A protein has these predicted regions:
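Gly/Ser/Thr/Pro-rich low-complexity, intrinsically disordered segments
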Residues: 19-397
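Sec-dependent N-terminal signal peptides
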Residues: 4-13
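C-terminal segment of classical bacterial N-terminal signal peptides
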Residues: 13-19
Length: 397
């Protein structure tokens, strides 16, 4: 059935339209009102892109994100995540692309951990780290891409500890991390590195703008604690020299306070973090501009040790006042598509009309799915399992 869908997709291509930067071939012209899908053959260099343009004014279309296997740990293909979302029955996934960066290997059990923001159906699953490269949509449909930070602390008695991470590896620099059931079955921590505190009484799921009391049920230094389905684990690094750590005793009560800043981010229903802001106010990231100018010799299609300057498969998300853009550029296939540098990717986004954009995970992860069929040609010759995904969904009547 999936092969059949892919064949049909290739047949449903309208007459090519030539633009200044290349040729556009519309795909599935009647798939949904307010949705424009096309293949874009970039004329400047050998690169093939797949683009979805969603009208922000079409009430039946929606932006969503999805977590692999519905938890942080583990990986899943974009197509499988889209299938699971459609099976819920209220909306159908029309377009799906791969999402953000994180641990693709095992990394001592942390395979699947995201490195940046992920909010799904109003649940805060991981906090923002690259604060410039985040995108979110509120329940009212407002698009947000302003720099965002998490401000959080864990109070115990008169003392407060800053909470730095949610569902992250202990190696990511945080001295206090909260693990919710959304991570997986256990924390995968090392017993020599910190103290783990089992807390109860926190209403789940965790959300932005969250304030609730909790009770300490257990304190352990064994590591890799099981995460209860109705509670959480607070991990505190042994490097944190704070007298308040000794206050976490069984039976003690405290308060967890969390908010995103600026405050409009507390209203997001779906949000995702990438790596590197490509566009802001219609202008390319100045760092990318400077790197492009400093490049001594630009060789089309060349891969480089500096990833920003290397021609690679790319995935990006952009928007303007009227349109959401999801883009995947194929690469590492010289006779078909060599890929793009990040400066080139940003330039194409401007050409298409985007004013704001962030870079998502690329390389072998870059995947573009329409109606359960992988449309692009992933560089690994097969669809890769990834960490999260971005959807355009449509209401099911």
């Amino acid at each position: 059935m999936r092969k059949f869908c892919a064949i049909i997709c290739l047949l449903l291509i309208t007459t090519p339209v030539v633009h200044a930067g290349g040729e556009r071939k519309t795909l599935f012209p009647d798939l949904a009102p307010g949705l424009h899908l096309y293949r874009y053959d970039w004329a400047v260099e050998t690169c093939v892109l797949y683009v979805a343009e969603m009208s922000r004014h079409e009430p039946t279309l929606h932006f969503e994100v999805a977590l692999a296997n519905a938890q942080v740990l583990g990986k899943e293909t974009v197509r499988s995540m889209a299938d699971r979302r459609t099976q819920r029955g209220d909306r159908h996934v029309l377009v799906a692309i791969n999402g953000g960066f994180g641990v693709l290997g095992d990394m001592r059990g942390y395979g699947g951990v995201l490195e940046n923001l992920h909010v799904q159906d109003g649940e805060l699953i991981t906090q923002p780290t690259d604060t410039e490269a985040c995108f979110g949509v509120t329940e009212s449909g407002e698009f947000l891409s302003t720099p965002v930070q998490m401000k959080a602390n864990v109070q115990i008695g008169a003392h407060a500890l800053p909470l730095g991470c949610i569902n992250q590896r202990r190696l990511d620099g945080c001295q206090v991390t909260l693990y919710t059931p959304r991570l997986g079955e256990s924390t995968h921590t090392n017993r020599r590195r910190g103290t783990e505190i089992l807390i109860s009484g926190l209403p789940l799921p965790l959300t932005p703008n969250y304030v609730h009391s909790y009770r300490v049920e257990d304190v352990s230094r064994d590591g890799n604690s099981a995460i209860p389905r109705d509670g959480a684990i607070l991990w505190i690094s042994t490097r944190l020299k704070d007298a308040s750590v000794s206050k976490f005793n069984t039976g003690a009560n405290g308060t967890l306070t969390l908010t995103l800043s600026p405050p409009e981010w507390n209203r997001v229903q779906h949000a995702i973090g990438g790596r590197i802001r490509l566009l802001k106010d219609g202008k390319i990231n100045e760092t990318l501009v400077e790197m492009h100018r400093a490049e001594k010799r630009h060789t089309p299609g060349k891969r480089a040790s500096v990833l920003n300057l290397s021609h690679e498969p790319r995935t990006a998300l952009g928007y303007n006042a009227d349109t959401l853009f999801l883009i995947v550029a194929d690469g590492r296939q010289p006779k078909y598509s060599t890929g793009l540098t990040l400066y080139e990717l940003a330039s194409i986004l401007i050409e298409l009309g985007a004013t704001e954009a962030i870079n998502l995970d690329g390389g072998s992860s870059s995947t573009f799915v329409i109606n359960d069929a992988v449309i692009n040609k992933p560089s690994g010759q097969r669809e890769r399992e990834v960490l999260n995904a971005v959807f355009i969904t449509a209401d099911i009547p």
